Structures are given as structure tokens and as C-alpha cells.
Amino acid sequence: MKKYFKFILAAVLVVVLVVVMVLIKNGNIVNFDNRAYNVVTSNTNTFLDNMYKVFTFLGSTLFIVGACIFILVFMKNKKMAGVIVGSVAISTVANNVIKLIFRRERPVVRRLVEEHSFSFPSGHTMAAVTLYGILIFFVMKSRLNKKARITISVVLGLFPICVAVSRIYLGAHFASDVTGAAITSTALLLVETYFIEKYYDKIEKSK
């Protein structure tokens, strides 16, 4: 049972994702989306506008691609770098496929950034959860002391949260878009890290 725990949890998340999709299609998640938007935008000003634009940049294509190139070029362990970039690539493909299948339009609210693709699931959130999530995985597996591992992981874990909230605040996504994105990326990460752990010794020793 323990051996397949990640697969079981990933399967549960897929079921939850399907439920979210059904609720969206049936229009039964409107209240959740509206309440979340009202909470996030209960206080708006120029400072917050700019702050959330910075947060959203941390999940943007430009930043994520730049980070992946940096990792590939400067990370000594090329297999580990390849795994990180590969995880992001898988997430990107999954996001685009789901967007094309689901075809949800963007929210009609005060929008501070312009987006032209479909809304569900949030690409910024999926990319952020995947990149920072896989980095957390490797940090926790590293030889750093426990305090350093936890501190770095907590800081990295804040980034996808900030990205997700920023997408709602900026009017780019419904709350259910970022929720679906987080669920999808987490399910993918669970499956990916299962296989990474099986071959971790080979990956960790590779240069």
C-alpha cells in the first residue's frame, strides 16, 4: 500500500479535478469563484497592483523558460537539471491540452493583464507549482541540514501560492482555474517523483 501511495493520491486528485470540471460546466462553482475574487480584491491600490504583477511574473512563460535555461546551463548535475526541465515541459503540455479540451473563457472583471488563451486551468499556476514543487523535492532530498532544507522549501512553497493569488487579483483567472491548475500539477508531481525516487541514486550521482 505504502509503495503505491503516491499513485493512489494522484488518482484521488484526478477524481477531484474531474469534479471541479463538472461543477464548472454545470455552473455550480460560480459562488466560489465570486467569493474568492471578492476576498482577494477587497483591497486594491497601485502598490498591490504592481506587487501582484511581480508575483505573476514568477509563473510567466518568460520567467519559467529563463529559469529552465539557467538550470540547464549552470546546474552541475545535468540529469537532475533534465528532470526539472522535463517536469515543467510535461506540465506545459498537459496545461495546453486541457485548455483546448475545456475551452473556458476568461473572467469578465477588472483585468490588469491581457491574456489570449483559454482560462482553465491556469498556466502560470501549473508552471509555478511544477517548477517550485520539483525544486522542493530535490531540496528535501539534498544533503543540506534539516533547518536549511525546511527553510528553503517553505520559501519556495510560497511562490506558487503568490502566483495563484495574483492570477485572481489581476483578473486573469477564476479561483477554480488556479485550483484546477494546482490539483493537476500536484497529481503530475506525485507520479513524477515516484519514478524519480526509484532512480534517485543514479540521478544524484550523475554529473
Question: Where in the sequence are the language-model features?
Answer:
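N-terminal transmembrane-helix/juxtamembrane module of multi-pass inner/ER membrane proteins
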Residues: M1-T61, L100-F102, R106-L112
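Alpha-helical transmembrane segments of integral membrane proteins
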Residues: F5-A10, Y52, K79-S87, A148-V155, ...
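Alpha-helical transmembrane spans of integral membrane proteins, capturing the lipid-embedded, hydrophobic core
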Residues: A11-V15, V65, I84, V88-T92, ...
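Aromatic-anchored segments of alpha-helical transmembrane domains
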Residues: V16-V20, I90-V97, L158-R167
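Short helix-capping/hinge motifs at transmembrane helix termini and TM-loop junctions
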Residues: I24-N26, M75-K76, F102-R103, L170-G171, ...
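Membrane-interface loops
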Residues: V30-N31, V73-N145
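Juxtamembrane membrane-interface segments at transmembrane alpha-helix termini
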Residues: N45-N50, A94-E105, V163-Y169, V191-I196
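Membrane-embedded catalytic cores of phosphoryl/pyrophosphoryl-handling enzymes
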Residues: R111-K207
